[in-house]
């Protein structure tokens, strides 16, 4: 009787320890939310296009372009010719393109995203996918139905 009870407690302890280890090995990326470095993928070529650093400031998320993957023949530090106002003519590297996203359940909403290729700003919402390895980024005008979705991949380097 005592041996059976001891075996039961030992089994329960082992089960709990195993569960704790499994949780400990869960991706830290999901725990951090969308903050960190993300590789954007070109819609047409399916090749990496840029690295965006998403950071939190005063409870809101922002994203800044850290790096561009460009052909060696192209300008390696282009400026935003199509942007308006203070951003016109500014270097794209270092530019904040995601602004003011607030946590709303499993996604971050209420912010905006700038497309330096056309200089336009869109409403934006983002959500983690695949255990925090991917980021679904939706830019839209008016309603979320009228927009475009990209999937960014968490940067490894």
Predicted regions and their residues:
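Short polar/acidic secondary-structure junctions
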Residues: 30, 43-45, 116, 127-129, ...
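Central antiparallel beta-sheet cores of small beta-barrel/beta-sandwich binding domains
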Residues: 25, 40-124
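N-terminal secretory signal peptides that target proteins for export/translocation
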Residues: 1-3
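N-terminal helix-cap/turn-to-beta initiation motif at the start of protein domains
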Residues: 22-36
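Short aromatic-glycine motifs in intrinsically disordered, low-complexity regions
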Residues: 83-89, 136-143
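Bacterial N-terminal signal peptides
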Residues: 8-17
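Edge beta-strand at a domain terminus
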Residues: 24, 132-134, 140-157
């Amino acid at each position: 009787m005592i041996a059976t009870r001891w075996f039961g407690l030992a089994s329960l302890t082992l089960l709990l320890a195993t569960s704790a280890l499994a949780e400990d090995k869960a991706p830290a990326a999901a725990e951090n939310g969308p903050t960190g470095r993300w590789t954007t993928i070109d819609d047409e070529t399916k090749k990496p296009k840029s690295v965006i650093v998403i950071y939190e400031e005063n409870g809101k998320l922002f994203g800044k372009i850290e790096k561009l993957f460009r052909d060696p023949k192209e300008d390696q530090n282009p400026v935003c010719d199509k942007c308006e106002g203070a951003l016109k003519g500014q270097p794209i590297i270092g530019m904040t393109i995601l602004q003011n996203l607030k946590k709303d359940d499993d996604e971050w909403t209420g912010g905006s995203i700038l497309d330096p290729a056309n200089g336009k700003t869109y409403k934006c919402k983002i959500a983690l996918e695949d255990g925090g390895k991917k980021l679904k980024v939706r830019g839209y005008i008016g309603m979320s139905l009228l927009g475009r979705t990209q999937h960014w991949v968490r940067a490894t380097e």
